[in-house]
UniProtKB/Swiss-Prot annotation:
GO molecular function, one term: ubiquitin protein ligase activity
A Gene Ontology term for the protein's cellular component: GID complex
Protein's job: Involved in the proteasome-dependent degradation of fructose-1,6-bisphosphatase.
LisH domain sequence ranges: 125-157
Protein name: Protein FYV10
Zinc finger (RING-Gid-type): 334-395
Species whose genome carries this gene: Pyricularia oryzae (strain 70-15 / ATCC MYA-4617 / FGSC 8958) (Rice blast fungus)
Length: 410
């Protein structure tokens, strides 16, 4: 029977990995509520003001009946606009509640289990793996494949497809040298960006200024100066270096090479803005900066990694993944020594084992495989072999028991 401590589920680690699974819908619901509140506050003030002006003008005879009807039509249009916007907020809230309910149920399933031997754990683990793969694909721009996988596995409520698709759309617009969608996103999250002291909007405005100056035409240069006065100069205390560079760009056109300004004219700045957007987006939504799959994989690799996994023999094994299965080292089942994971696991720490689970009666077979003697004898007995023969548990090779050699761990 397996050691209970080795099969017991560490629920705290599971919950630690799935923090964003529950936090993101909650944060999005708060944002959705603020949007609905803003719509009601802003639009109701406009309707109230128009109603008051209409009533006052009508009583004083300043408005004709046609003017009053036009104002009433305008108020009705605004009211319909409020209803439409609130309906969108209501639909979004219902979607987020559905997501949150599905995620609470998903996390609750593992909380109700005690060991990995539970028959439900394998299915739960497969669902979690599908979630991590979808998250990885969304972060790397494979949106259609991620959606197809989520729909096929029925886990759409457990992954943040809409959030990452919106992010990738803005990222793509920056790659196409447009800041329009990114600025709209900054406007939607103005208060939150101010709280985290983000410089993303300033860098977008700075890039707008650079593109205006790049044209080197008088109207565009004058527009750039106006743009700088409105969006850059007010931040001269916060970003003095960038503001000084903006002023210097007027004296150093693109065709003149200068170490201080050549990097500002380079198109790689758009890649920098794209990277900065992703960092800001993840920070704003409390998302990990790298895929959750990497976290889970690194933990698993570390738990299995030993110093022998990156010896010369292990590297030779990783370089020859198609070797014949009859060879002892080439048929190793160690995932760290495999060609796919050997390089990935090189920088993760070694496993920390406070308790040994190595069999006490290890013996070496002629094919250089090591097993516990009791296991070999039991397997031979179940296989109907003579009492003086043993059978390799993996390859099925049969050897005389006299050819086994005792193994001592040093």
């Amino acid at each position: 029977m397996a050691d209970h401590q080795t099969t017991k589920i560490d629920k705290s680690n599971h919950l630690l990995l799935d923090q964003t699974l529950l936090r993101l819908p909650y944060d999005l619901m708060r944002k959705n509520f603020r949007n609905a509140h803003f719509v009601v506050e802003h639009e109701s003030k406009a309707i109230t003001k128009l109603l008051k002006d209409t009533a006052t003008g009508s009583l004083k005879g300043k408005h004709s009946s046609d003017d009053v009807l036009k104002n009433i039509d305008a108020m009705l249009a605004k009211a319909k606009g409020i209803k439409r916007k609130l309906q969108a907020c209501s639909d979004e809230e219902a979607r987020l509640y559905r997501q949150l309910g599905a995620r609470i149920k998903h996390v609750g399933e593992v909380v109700s289990m005690e060991t990995v031997d539970d028959v439900r754990y394998e299915q739960w683990s497969r669902t979690r793996l599908d979630r991590l793969i979808v998250d990885y694909m969304l972060r790397h721009g494979y949106n259609e494949s991620a959606c197809a996988l989520a729909d096929d596995r029925g886990i759409r409520d457990l992954v943040d497809i809409d959030t990452f698709i919106h992010m990738s759309r803005i990222q793509e617009s920056l790659a196409n040298r447009s800041v329009t969608e990114a600025l709209a996103w900054c406007h939607e999250n103005k208060k939150e960006l101010r709280k985290i002291d983000s410089n993303f909007e300033f860098m977008l405005r700075f890039q707008q200024y650079i593109e205006l100056v790049r044209s080197q035409t008088l109207p565009k240069v004058l527009e750039a100066i106006t743009h700088a006065r409105k969006y850059l100069i007010p931040f001269k205390e916060t970003y003095p270096h960038e503001v000084n560079q903006a002023a210097g760009l007027l004296a150093y056109p693109p065709e003149q090479t200068s170490d201080s300004y050549s990097n500002l004219w380079g198109q790689e700045r758009w890649e920098m803005l794209s990277t900065l957007f992703i960092e800001t987006h993840h920070r704003l939504l409390s998302l990990p900066s790298f895929p959750l799959l990497h976290i889970a994989l690194s933990s698993g690799l570390s738990a299995l990694k030993t110093p022998a996994c990156h010896t010369a023999g292990a590297r030779d094994l990783a370089d020859t993944p198609n070797s014949a299965p009859g060879n002892s080292l080439d048929s190793s089942m160690c995932p760290i020594c495999s060609a796919e994971l050997n390089e990935l696991a090189e920088n993760v720490p070694y496993a920390h084992h406070s308790k040994s689970h190595v069999e006490h009666d290890l013996v070496l077979l002629p094919n250089d495989r090591v097993y516990g003697k009791a296991r070999l004898e039991e397997y031979a007995r179940k296989s109907g072999l003579p009492h003086n023969c043993v059978k390799d548990l993996r390859t099925g090779e049969i050897y005389p028991a006299s050819r086994m050699k005792k193994v001592f761990i040093t």
